[in-house]
Amino acid sequence: MLIIPAIDLKDGACVRLRQGRMDDSTVFSDDPVAMAARWVEAGCRRLHLVDLNGAFEGQPINGEVVTAIARRYPDLPIQIGGGIRSLETIEHYVKAGVGYVIIGTKAVKQPEFVGEACRAFPGKVIVGLDARDGFVATDGWAEVSSVQVVDLARRFEADGVSAIVYTDIAKDGMMQGCNVEATAALAAATRIPVIASGGIHDLGDIRKLLDARAPGIVGAITGRAIYEGTLDVAEAQALCDGFKG
């Protein structure tokens, strides 16, 4: 399982939100490229970037920062989400050297777009499913749909999606523990690899994910915990590498 540091971008800075609220953010750095360097030096093998402005605007807003990070670390897989709602945007990021694009809102509102994206950019597409009480949320978590997470995930199995990033909104940014049960259930219900996100606080939470022994859980995204020092990236990755499940 990969430990994937998150860099959330708002107005060009590296921030973290609580439960997806743009008015409840903490600025951790005004230099996201330097922050990326910090996690690379800690030994991370993938980075998770989110264009928060883009998620709310429906188009890339912090694209220059994303491109700068991708060009500085061409051998590091980077996944980017937030405002990706057209093939043109995906093409822009792929050409910039980004490894994966995360389709969120558009995957819920127009599921057939995921298939189009996978055909145009095979191996490059991740679907981001954000949920509240098992139902998918969209538009930067501002709207909660009537669509069940598991039902939507299964729909994408035939498209060739590389992974699903599953976020429990109630947990995100709160550091009260990952929703292991829901994440493991999703991994068991679909053939698509699942990346856990939201609520990870410390090594105990990483152990709980590992102890779930769900082979479909291939990664864990962490943000506030690594910025506030309750989780060490290198230590967490070493735990995952040494786990015998």
From Swiss-Prot:
Name this polypeptide is given: 1-(5-phosphoribosyl)-5-[(5-phosphoribosylamino)methylideneamino] imidazole-4-carboxamide isomerase
Active site: D8 (proton acceptor), D130 (proton donor)
This enzyme's EC code(s): 5.3.1.16
Reaction catalysis annotation: 1-(5-phospho-beta-D-ribosyl)-5-[(5-phospho-beta-D-ribosylamino)methylideneamino]imidazole-4-carboxamide = 5-[(5-phospho-1-deoxy-D-ribulos-1-ylimino)methylamino]-1-(5-phospho-beta-D-ribosyl)imidazole-4-carboxamide
Pathway(s) it belongs to: Amino-acid biosynthesis; L-histidine biosynthesis; L-histidine from 5-phospho-alpha-D-ribose 1-diphosphate: step 4/9
Family matches, as HAMAP family: HisA
Cellular component GO terms held in the UniProt record: cytoplasm
One GO MF term attached to the UniProt entry: 1-(5-phosphoribosyl)-5-[(5-phosphoribosylamino)methylideneamino]imidazole-4-carboxamide isomerase activity
Top-rank taxon: Bacteria
Stated family: Belongs to the HisA/HisF family.
UniProt source species: Azotobacter vinelandii (strain DJ / ATCC BAA-1303)
Keywords, alphabetical: Amino-acid biosynthesis, Cytoplasm, Histidine biosynthesis, Isomerase
A GO biological-process term: L-tryptophan biosynthetic process
One of the Pfam families matching this protein, by short name: His_biosynth
Compartments, as annotated in UniProt: Cytoplasm
